[in-house]
From Swiss-Prot:
It comes from the Bacteria. One of its GO terms (biological process) is regulation of DNA-templated transcription. This is Uncharacterized HTH-type transcriptional regulator Rv1556. The keyword Repeat applies. Keywords: DNA-binding, Repeat, Transcription, Transcription regulation. Residues 1-20 are annotated as: Disordered. PANTHER family: HTH-TYPE TRANSCRIPTIONAL REGULATOR RUTR, TETR-FAMILY TRANSCRIPTIONAL REGULATOR. GO terms for molecular function: DNA-binding transcription factor activity; transcription cis-regulatory region binding.
Amino acid sequence: MVGAVTQIADRPTDPSPWSPRETELLAVTLRLLQEHGYDRLTVDAVAASARASKATVYRRWPSKAELVLAAFIEGIRQVAVPPNTGNLRDDLLRLGELICREVGQHASTIRAVLVEVSRNPALNDVLQHQFVDHRKALIQYILQQAVDRGEISSAAISDELWDLLPGYLIFRSIIPNRPPTQDTVQALVDDVILPSLTRSTG
């Protein structure tokens, strides 16, 4: 467990897998998503706005769902810098606030993409390896920093903790009329996560 945490903690973020031109296309896609929503987004509009051919877009992303998922993941990757406040509680609060802000901006897109993911195993693999694993690496980095500072023991870290903070906040963000608030983040950190990490392991 400790070895795995340390290995990823040394490299909390990965470089973009996309070329500069592909990154530009994904940025255009994300902008149009925010302006028009998933249902009204078309590959034609993305190609026109990015001054690219539809063939160029489809060659890299064969479906709208794949394009949108890639755009969302890349957008999150660019802003998901692990906080380093000097203490675990503040790091977790900062990360929770980041998740709420970014997921809240794209809640409708996430709902639409999750429907497509449920129908397409290939999309599910992308979601797992490029989104879920990256969120896990951020949490691992934060927890390993806390271990190094002596705030918690590595023995207190369990696999379930990787999903708890991002998983619950994303769930609340995509449920209509129940967005998480700063109080939600604080309660999750103070009442659930920190007690789990600081409990005696015998």
